[in-house]
Amino acid sequence: MQNPREGMDLPQVIFSLVFIFIMIISSLWIMRPFFLGFAWASMVVVATWPIFLKLQILLWGNRACAVVMMTFSLLLVFIIPIVCLVNSLIDNSTSVISWLSSDKFRFPSLEWLQDIPIIGIKLFSSYQKLLNEGGAELITKVQPYMGKTTEFFVIQAGHFGRFILHLIFMLIFSALLYWNGEKVQSVIRHFAIRLGSKSGDSVVLLAGQAIRAVALGVVVTALVQGILSGIGLAISGIPYSSLLMMLIIIFCLVQLGPLPVLIPAIIWLYWNGKTTWGTVLLIWSCVVCILDHILRPILIRIGVDLPTVLILSGVIGGLIAFGMIGLFIGPVVLIISYRLISSWMDEIPAPNSLSKKSVQQLLFKKKN
């Protein structure tokens, strides 16, 4: 019997593997500038693919018009608001820095503290004592750091050229994926089937459902909370409400919620004696926070029938591990792992559940 290893040329195998490895690394290195844009485009296209198909039907089956409309919609949703936000931040930075560094920056009197029952007068006297004894020194120490901190954030916001470039790549790749969506899906599913047979195909379909669930449950909820919070801030008279609204949306995406922005805004209103508007914003903030616990689980269930805790854990962990793109990568990885483990366990039937009486009988027999 002939040994199959006799015809194996070991140096040829080694050089072939080294060559394949070098080609893969070189290809990845060449495509490295496009990874982030392509990843975002993939997530956006998968999340909005049902909308794209419905739009194509409304346009009498014209794929080109549907691609143009969806790309233009993405342009309106992503590029224009971000450019306007950064320009507004840069334009208003000079006045903010000068105000923080000037002598006009003073702590308010907080006379409304006296109206608080029982402890109001004591709080007001303690606050006035703090201002009289150490307020000036505190302001002197805080002012340089506040100005420098604001300047740092403004400088970082000014370097948004690379970010805009990634967004442009995202738009280009999104248009290409919309145009060839079925072909790309077929190639990915074929590759998955080659790796894992039928389970590989189900993993690809599950990944698409997970991305849509995150887009519906997390992104849509963050947008709704941000818009409602921005309306409340604007009505209450909070300055720079549009900038704060964008900040709230970011906080909601990273699962911190709107309270890190709304609570300081409420304190600022009470601080400046606007108790009525402070109370209004407080009630509105409670409504916005309650909406998060109602809307998000419903939207996630629409996208995929999986545990909400699993998706939210993936969102938070993915953000910490991969940044903003981890918002989608984290849930996809956890959900795929969850389904693979579940399907592997389901290959063997689960043990029969025993009643309390049966368990006691078994324990009694063992003792005897």
Curated annotation (Swiss-Prot):
Membrane topology: Multi-pass membrane protein
Subcellular location: Cell membrane
Top-level taxon in the UniProt lineage: Bacteria
Record bears the keyword Electron transport: no
Name of the protein in question: Putative transport protein bbp_117
TM ranges: 13-35, 39-61, 68-90, 159-181, 216-238, 248-270, 277-299, 314-336
Tagged with keyword Transferase: no
Source organism: Buchnera aphidicola subsp. Baizongia pistaciae (strain Bp)
Record key words, sorted: Cell membrane, Membrane, Transmembrane, Transmembrane helix, Transport
Pfam families xref list: AI-2E_transport (PF01594)
Location, primary (coarse class): membrane
GO cellular component terms, semicolon-separated: plasma membrane
Assigned protein family: Belongs to the autoinducer-2 exporter (AI-2E) (TC 2.A.86) family.
